[in-house]
Amino acid sequence: MADTSLSPVLPLFANTPSSVSFKKLRKRLVRGALEVIDTYGLVDRRAIETGEKPHPKWLVCLSGGKDSYGLLAVLLDLQWQGALPVDLIACNLDQGQPGFPKHILPEWLTQNGVTHKIITEDTYSIVTDKVPEGRTYCSMCSRLRRGILYRVAREEGCEAIVLGHHRDDALATFMMNLIHGGRLAAMPPKLLNDDGDVQVFRPLITAAEDDLAKFAEAMEFPIIPCNLCGSQDGLQRVVMNRMLDEWERKKPGTRQVMAKALTNVRPSHLHDPRVFDFAGLMLGGKGEDDPNVPF
């Protein structure tokens, strides 16, 4: 794993707190992201360093929320330390929401010397027109946004779209799929699109949302609230997060244990013949007993 000792000269961090707690927080987020990058092969650092492959380009999605700001800051930090040999392009999709402060992100990105692209597409009108009253906008909004970002990634020559989803997003998605979808699935750290030409990366997928909130406050990011999906009542994701909050209150550390479970899967102890050959289990073969399963 590459060295992630912190340098004080990255412009984005020039005026950040000098407290030990902030330094630990920053280091925790940076090292966590680097571990995800290395574990799931988001970049072939060795091949790039030896010249076998050119520097890839990543399209880093910036919504103006705390998570995407944190994502960009962490990636820039890794890039600055020489641990991420990737060209980064920050991208904001202006979806035409009424009252959206168009000046904030371009000014902040320019001030911090970040290469960026602002895309304007009025998906707001489409979503509010097509989605029936009382239904949530999330699904259609996400599909439209994803299609636009794939297109921009291709136009910019980017091999990957990078998103700021974190551990708590993954757990809420897992619970939604479990309870409402009848399947075991969360958010993958690395995904290939249907056309096979653009990847989706989530380097913060092991980061705690609380850490990102503290980081955003310390960094004084100019947060832009979502006035579409984020303002609707009755979102199932909100319900799942409340459920997880309650479990965390009753048993601190529950979220981290659940996140660990996503990396510790035993297909032989589930019921899906597509991922485990139950029919092929024969006497005399290698067994897989589990003392934690009631007999």
From Swiss-Prot:
Designated name of the protein: tRNA-cytidine(32) 2-sulfurtransferase
Record's subcellular location: Cytoplasm
PANTHER family noted in UniProt: AMINOTRAN_5 DOMAIN-CONTAINING PROTEIN, SULFURTRANSFERASE-RELATED
GO cellular component: cytoplasm
General function of this protein: Catalyzes the ATP-dependent 2-thiolation of cytidine in position 32 of tRNA, to form 2-thiocytidine (s(2)C32). The sulfur atoms are provided by the cysteine/cysteine desulfurase (IscS) system.
EC class: transferase
Similarity field: Belongs to the TtcA family.
Source superkingdom: Bacteria
Record-linked Pfam families: ATP_bind_3
Cofactor mode of binding and number, as noted: Binds 1 [4Fe-4S] cluster per subunit. The cluster is chelated by three Cys residues, the fourth Fe has a free coordination site that may bind a sulfur atom transferred from the persulfide of IscS.
UniProt subunit comment: Homodimer.
GO molecular function: 4 iron, 4 sulfur cluster binding; ATP binding; magnesium ion binding; sulfurtransferase activity; tRNA binding
UniProtKB keywords: 4Fe-4S, ATP-binding, Cytoplasm, Iron, Iron-sulfur, Magnesium, Metal-binding, Nucleotide-binding, RNA-binding, Transferase, tRNA processing, tRNA-binding
NCBIfam families recorded: PRK10696.1 (NF007972)
Note: The thiolation reaction likely consists of two steps: a first activation step by ATP to form an adenylated intermediate of the target base of tRNA, and a second nucleophilic substitution step of the sulfur (S) atom supplied by the hydrosulfide attached to the Fe-S cluster.
Enzyme Commission number(s) of this protein: 2.8.1.-
GO BP of this protein: tRNA thio-modification
Pathway stated in the Swiss-Prot or TrEMBL entry: tRNA modification
Catalytic activity, as annotated: cytidine(32) in tRNA + S-sulfanyl-L-cysteinyl-[cysteine desulfurase] + AH2 + ATP = 2-thiocytidine(32) in tRNA + L-cysteinyl-[cysteine desulfurase] + A + AMP + diphosphate + H(+)
Short sequence motif PP-loop motif: positions: 63-68
Required cofactor(s): Mg(2+); [4Fe-4S] cluster
